[in-house]
Amino acid sequence: MERRQSICPQGRLPFYSAVVRSTSDIQASVRFASRHNLRLVIKNTGHDSAGRSSAPHSFQIHTSLLQNISLHKNFIARGSTTGRGPAVTLGAGVMQWQAYVHGAKNGYTILGGECPTVGAIGGFLQGGGVSSIHSFTRGLAVDQVLEYQVVSAKGDLITANEDNNQDLFWALKGGGGGTFGVVTEATVRVFSDDPVTVTSTKIEAAAANVLFWKEGVHELLRLLQRFNNLHVAGQLVISAPTKDSLQAGLELHFANLTDETQAIQLLRSEARALETHGISASTSVRVQRKASSELRMKPDLYPPHYGILEASVLISAATFHANDGPALIASKLSGLTLKPNDILFTSNLGGRVSENTAIEIALHPAWREAAQLVTLVRVVEPSIEGKLSALNDLTARDVPILYSIDPAAKISYRNLGDPQEKEFQARYWGADNYARLAATKAAWDPSHLFMTSLGVGSEVWDAEGICRKRRGFRAKASSLIGM
C-alpha cells in the first residue's frame, strides 16, 4: 500500500473537539488530554486573530454550550460572609449580546465590549476587557470580577476569589485566557442600565488631502481630550470607505443624559469648523434609554469574507492630555495607510480605570496611567500569501508607527496585539507582573498542559506549542524580562 505524503493535513484546525455541556465534561476532557499528553486548546467563540483558540494536531475543548446565567441581588463569594452587591454569574459560553439582553430584561448591565458575538468571560475578560462606553466610568472588565470557577490542569474544580486561591484569581484578571485552567463560569458586578445620549461627529475627505489628519483627526482628538476633561467618554473610529477616501467619526457618550439638545449644544460649544479645509463634516445625536442597547446593536468587527489582523498600543495620560497631544497622535497615525475595510479606533481609558488602583490586576501597571487604547484592524486578503504579507507588514511597518506615539512605554493589549510580538512579556505585563504570572503558572500547571500563543510560558515552546525548547521555563522567562 502506497504511503500518503501530507505535510499539513488539516492546517491549524484541531484533530478532535470535545463540545462540552457541563463542568464534569470539562474535567473529563482535561484529564483525558493530560493522560495522553495532548496539545490542548480552549475555544468559545474563536474571536482571536492570533489563533490562540486553535492549534495543529490538537485536542480542543469547546465551551460554547455553557449558557447558564444567574442574577444575584447580593453576591456572597465562597469562603466569605460579606455580600458584594448585585452580580451575575455567566457560563463560559455566554456571548456579550446574550448578557446584554438578559440584563436589559432584568434592569442591569455588565461591563462588556462592543462586539456582540465575543464571549463575555473568555479571553475578553481574562485578558483585561475594555468597554468603549463603560470603562471610563466603571473601569476594566477585570475590575468587576468577584469569582471564577476553574477546572485546573489536574481536572479539579477550583474556586478562585479574594478568599480562595488568590494567586490564581489575580492571574485570571489579565493574565490571559487558556493559560491557567478552563474557566467554566465567572461572577461579575452589575450596575444599573442607565440611559446614554450619543453624539456623532463625522468627517470625510480625499485620501490625498493631508489636512484630513492634520486638521480633521487632530480636531476630533482635541474634542475627545476636552470632553474627557469634562468627564465624558468617547471613541474615535477612522476608516477608508474607498481607496481614494478617508473618514473619521467621533462618538461622545453622555451618561445619564436624555436631552438631545443639551448634548448637541455642549458639542457645538467646543467644536471648530473644518469645512474650509476641504473636509466635509456632519453631526447627529441619538438617545438610548438603556446603555446596553448601544453596545448590543453594534455591528460585528469581523468581515464576512475572511479574517483580520490586529495591533494596539496604550497612550499615556501624560501624552494624550499634553497641549500638543492631539496633534502629535494625529501626525503619527497619519503614517498608517488605511485600505478599504481597515479600521483604526480608540478605546477610552483613564477615568475609573485610573482610579481603581486598589483592585489588583495582572495587566501591565501602565494601564492605570493610560488615557486611550489605539487599535489597528487590518483586513486580510483570502490567500496564504496575502495573510503572510499582511502579517509581516503589520509587524515591520504598522506596529513601529503605533509604538512611536509613546516611545518610552510601548505597551500593548494582548487581546488585540500583534501576533508576532517578540517582546510580549514586557509589552503585555511588565517584568514584575510577568515574574508573578510565571510563578502562578508553575504552581497550577507545571507540565504546561495549557498553552497559548504569546501566553505566559509560551517562550519555552515552538510557535505552535508542539515541541518544548530545552531551557527551563523559569530560567527562560527570567532572561527575557531581565530579572
Curated annotation (Swiss-Prot):
Domain FAD-binding PCMH-type, residue spans: 10-193
Copy the pathway line from the protein's UniProt record: Alkaloid biosynthesis; ergot alkaloid biosynthesis
**Named cofactor requirement(s):** FAD
**Gene Ontology BP, a term:** indole alkaloid biosynthetic process
Supply one GO molecular-function term.
Answer: oxidoreductase activity
User: PROSITE patterns, from UniProt?
Assistant: FAD_PCMH
What phenotype has been reported when the gene encoding this protein is knocked out?
A: Abolishes the production of clavine alkaloids but also of more complex alkaloids such as ergopeptines. Accumulates N-methyl-dimethylallyltryptophan (Me-DMAT) and traces of dimethylallyltryptophan (DMAT).
What protein family does this chain belong to?
Belongs to the oxygen-dependent FAD-linked oxidoreductase family.
Physiological role = FAD-linked oxidoreductase; part of the gene cluster that mediates the biosynthesis of fungal ergot alkaloid. DmaW catalyzes the first step of ergot alkaloid biosynthesis by condensing dimethylallyl diphosphate (DMAP) and tryptophan to form 4-dimethylallyl-L-tryptophan. The second step is catalyzed by the methyltransferase easF that methylates 4-dimethylallyl-L-tryptophan in the presence of S-adenosyl-L-methionine, resulting in the formation of 4-dimethylallyl-L-abrine.
What is this protein's record name? FAD-linked oxidoreductase easE
Instruction: Supply the source organism's classification.
Output: Eukaryota, Fungi, Dikarya, Ascomycota, Pezizomycotina
